[in-house]
A protein has these predicted regions:
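Extended interfacial segments that mediate partner engagement and assembly in macromolecular machines
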Residues: 65-73, 80-188, 208
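Rossmann-like S-adenosyl-L-methionine
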Residues: 2-21, 221-452
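Terminal RNA-binding accessory module
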Residues: 1-79, 110-113, 366
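Short, aliphatic-rich beta-strand segments
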Residues: 203, 209-219, 276-280
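Short, acidic/hydrophobic/Gly-rich beta-strand patch recurrent on exposed beta strands
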Residues: 25-30, 149-153, 215-217, 345
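Internal alpha/beta scaffold segment
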Residues: 158-199, 220-248
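Short, solvent-exposed loop/turn elements at beta->coil junctions and helix N-caps
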Residues: 120-127, 199-204, 432-436
Length: 452
């Protein structure tokens, strides 16, 4: 049973031993594992115990008595929001910690043979600031001003952010202009389910040409004076698309199913390597285009495709990876549960003049066996699942019997669990961590598996 520390404050001295999977410092108080956000390995700290369970303690950093040489200053708003869990660490050390986070996940969920040899050094992001192509900021009204930012960790208090150091400069520019215009024309802002208005601002910027798509997320399609906001913002040459997304407040997702284009195109175009992608307001796309090219190049290297190869692209999304590798193989079969993603994938096939990519909307667990029954024999299976991992598809991949699997992961824990299943039939050749999100504890990985 969890219990909050409701009595007198209990401050304890702690030596931090390592970094946890979410970027928190880990120490031990009375032999019980203690998690302290903002603390670094080898630091001696004072922390307040704020929660204790039979298995672990959560502490709040009060003071650093002996500081790590790798600690750096971090902007207050990022420390408060909790979104950038390693922003207080030098970048070279972040890369080391991220590899360790991956190793710790394997240690917990699946014991790798010779992990130090299999897990390579983390590939750095080409940019460590202004690397993100997209933001999605909730709105509020404070002292008569419309503000946007990130919620303070564990609360509904909005931390105002006027310049997101991770976001493309064009995204910052248009976000600030949108806030100003919403306030200027007194557009209704909704901060709860009882009011109607604009709830979020989202921008997506193409690193290929600098174009910006601005999306207002609202819980109604009838918003007074939004047309005046659009008329002012569209004067900016970099704005190529303005969209209203209508969301259902009862849904846990930020964006709803309905997009209304208020100005310009339904899409902006991004380019990774020689491949272009049309992206709508709802399209899922990697957030760091520079590091994405590194990731996709690593997929190409690990897949080692031949012109005669047939490739399975599971969880294909808008076709990003499959189309990137398509020029090196005979055919690509892509499947994704999201119908809108498959529509975008087929649009991207036309955009890139490709003739060897086939996309189907549906559950991969049903579609892939159907392809197998039709006599389609996959030489290479590329999988890029969500954070929840492969699920039942892990076992179904064993029946696909591809010579090789290339697994792209955004969650070390589910990766380790899935590899425990896949290694019944496949051998792990190498694991490449890649930093897609500098300043955070997130780490992506590409795994090469070959049939035993």
């Amino acid at each position: 049973m969890k219990k909050k520390n409701s009595g007198k404050k209990l401050n304890v001295l702690l030596t931090i031993k390592k970094i946890g999977i979410n970027g928190e410092g880990i120490g031990y108080y009375k032999k019980k594992i203690t998690f302290v956000k903002g603390a670094l390995p080898d630091e001696v700290i004072v922390c307040e115990i704020i929660e204790e369970t039979p298995k672990y303690i959560i502490g709040k950093l009060v003071k650093v008595k002996e500081s790590s040489p790798y600690r750096v200053e971090v902007k207050k708003e990022y420390a408060e929001s909790g979104a950038y869990g390693l922003a207080h660490v030098s970048y070279e050390k972040q890369l080391e910690y991220k590899r360790n986070i991956l190793l710790d996940a394997f240690d917990k969920y699946y014991k790798l043979p010779k992990p130090d040899k299999l897990v390579l050094k983390t590939l750095a992001s080409p940019m460590i600031e202004h690397y993100r192509n997209k933001n999605q900021f909730p709105l509020a009204v404070r002292n008569g001003r419309v503000i946007a930012g990130l919620y303070k960790e564990g609360s509904n208090d909005l931390v105002e952010i006027n310049e997101d150091v991770a976001l493309h400069e064009n995204g910052n520019k248009i976000t600030n202009l949108a806030k100003k215009c919403l306030g200027k024309y007194k557009v209704e802002i909704s901060t709860n389910k009882k009011t109607y208005g604009v709830k979020y601002i989202s921008t997506r910027t193409s690193f290929y040409n600098g174009d910006v798509q601005l999306t207002f997320v609202a819980n109604t399609d009838k918003i007074k004076n939004l047309d005046k906001v659009v008329n002012e913002i569209k004067r900016e040459a970099i704005v190529k698309s303005i969209v209203l997304n209508v969301t259902n407040d009862n849904d846990h997702l930020v964006m709803g199913s309905e997009n209304i284009t208020l100005y310009g195109s339904d899409y902006i175009v991004e380019k990774i390597g020689d491949t272009k992608y049309e992206l709508s307001a709802k399209s899922f796309f990697q957030l760091n285009p520079g590091a994405t090219k590194k990731l996709y190049d690593k997929v190409v290297e690990f897949a080692d495709l031949r012109e005669t190869n047939i490739v399975l692209d599971a969880f294909c999304g808008v076709g990003t990876i499959g189309q990137y590798v398509s020029r090196k193989c005979h055919e690509v079969y892509g499947v994704d549960i999201v119908e809108d993603a498959i529509k975008d994938a087929n649009n991207n096939v036309k955009l890139n003049n490709l003739t060897n990519c086939i996309y189907v909307a549906g559950d991969a667990n049903k579609i892939v066996p159907r392809w197998k029954k039709k006599g389609i024999n996959f030489d290479v299976a590329i999988v890029d699942p969500p954070r929840t991992g492969l699920g039942h598809l892990a076992k179904n991949l064993l029946d696909v019997d591809a010579k090789k699997i290339v697994y792209v992961s955004c969650n070390p824990s589910t990766l380790a669990r899935d590899l425990k299943v896949l290694t019944r039939k496949y051998k792990i050749r190498r694991i490449q961590p890649i930093d897609m999100f500098p300043g955070t504890a997130a780490v992506e990985a590409v795994v090469e598996l070959i049939k035993k």
